């Protein structure tokens, strides 16, 4: 529970608002004979991946998007995976799709992601689309960074001119996060920190916004946070079988805004996966 004065960055409530909007937009597309379709490629029987995929298709049902599932055995070859990707690239009912990660170790994840048609890249992580983001060109945006920006705006956290410290340089959050936040529409100043950063607390104490995306339990503590700063908790790890974020509980006593984990960024990642698919279908009518 957040103490008095600390505002919860509520991802679930914000997701529900997005779903109301998406349901109306999908209904218009359906009237035009263009119901969007989200595809998923799931390899193997990892329980976490299965749960994520189930959740994505449940979200589709809520807003009227068609679901296209391709569930493959764990011992599939790279060539067989390529065939599935090629089939979805050519499938007119599939507006956009994702390859659920991680893949089994014998498969080349980068090769699989690069094989996705950039025009059907629901995750916004194809190298072509990341390049378009660098160039400031329209393309599907990475879902988690886009969700974080939306969440901050929804709760009136000032972004323009803010000093944002991003902890973590992964391709799904850390690296593209800086690209989104330094666009002219956001105009933040970003410091990207990682395992090689010297004196991380000295940097985080300067930050107006901290985005923690590392997967190290409770690594961001109250003494690292400037009073009143916004703290976004993205990282997920398991401690004694329980999902745990990167942000320690005592941060709630100092920060002005904090995203819970779970229940903060995760729901928006899924919401913007659907948003990307709807926007891809809408762009065909433009």
Curated annotation (Swiss-Prot):
Cellular component GO terms held in the UniProt record: cytosol
Catalytic activity: (6R)-5,10-methylene-5,6,7,8-tetrahydrofolate + NADP(+) = (6R)-5,10-methenyltetrahydrofolate + NADPH; (6R)-5,10-methenyltetrahydrofolate + H2O = (6R)-10-formyltetrahydrofolate + H(+)
Domain of life: Bacteria
Residues reported in the UniProt entry to bind NADP(+): 168-170, 195, 236
InterPro entries: Aminoacid_DH-like_N_sf, NAD(P)-bd_dom_sf, THF_DH/CycHdrlase, THF_DH/CycHdrlase_cat_dom, THF_DH/CycHdrlase_NAD-bd_dom
Gene3D superfamilies, alphabetized: Leucine Dehydrogenase, chain A, domain 1, NAD(P)-binding Rossmann-like Domain
The keyword Oxidoreductase is annotated on this UniProt entry: yes
Biological processes annotated in GO: L-histidine biosynthetic process; methionine biosynthetic process; purine nucleotide biosynthetic process; tetrahydrofolate interconversion
Disulfide bonds: none
Pfam families per the UniProt record, alphabetical: THF_DHG_CYH, THF_DHG_CYH_C
Protein name listed in UniProt: Bifunctional protein FolD
């Amino acid at each position: 529970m957040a103490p008095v004065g600390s505002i919860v960055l509520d991802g679930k409530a914000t997701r529900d608002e997005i779903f109301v909007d998406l349901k109306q937009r999908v209904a218009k597309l359906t009237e035009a004979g263009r119901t969007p379709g989200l595809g998923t490629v799931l390899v193997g029987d990892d329980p976490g991946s299965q749960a994520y995929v189930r959740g994505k298709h449940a979200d589709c049902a809520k807003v009227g998007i068609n679901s296209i599932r391709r569930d493959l055995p764990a011992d599939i070859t790279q060539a067989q995976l390529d065939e599935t990707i090629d089939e979805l690239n050519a499938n007119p009912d599939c507006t956009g799709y994702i390859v659920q990660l991680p893949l089994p170790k014998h498969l080349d994840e980068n090769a699989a992601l690069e094989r996705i048609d950039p025009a059907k890249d629901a995750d916004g992580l194809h190298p072509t689309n990341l390049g378009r983001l660098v160039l400031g060109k329209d393309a599907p945006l990475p879902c988690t960074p886009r969700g974080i920006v939306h969440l901050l705006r929804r709760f009136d956290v000032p972004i323009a001119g803010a000093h944002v410290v991003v902890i973590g340089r992964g391709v799904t959050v850390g690296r593209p996060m800086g690209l989104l936040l330094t666009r002219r529409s956001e105009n933040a100043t970003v410091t990207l920190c990682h395992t090689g950063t010297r004196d991380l607390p000295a940097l985080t104490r300067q930050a107006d916004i901290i985005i923690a995306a590392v997967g190290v339990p409770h690594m961001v503590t109250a003494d690292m946070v400037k009073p009143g700063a916004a703290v976004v908790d993205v990282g997920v790890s398991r401690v004694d079988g329980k999902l745990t974020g990167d942000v320690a509980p005592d941060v709630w006593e100092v920060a002005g805004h904090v995203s819970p984990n779970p229940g903060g960024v995760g729901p928006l990642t899924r919401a913007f996966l659907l948003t990307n698919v709807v926007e891809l279908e809408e762009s065909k009518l433009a």
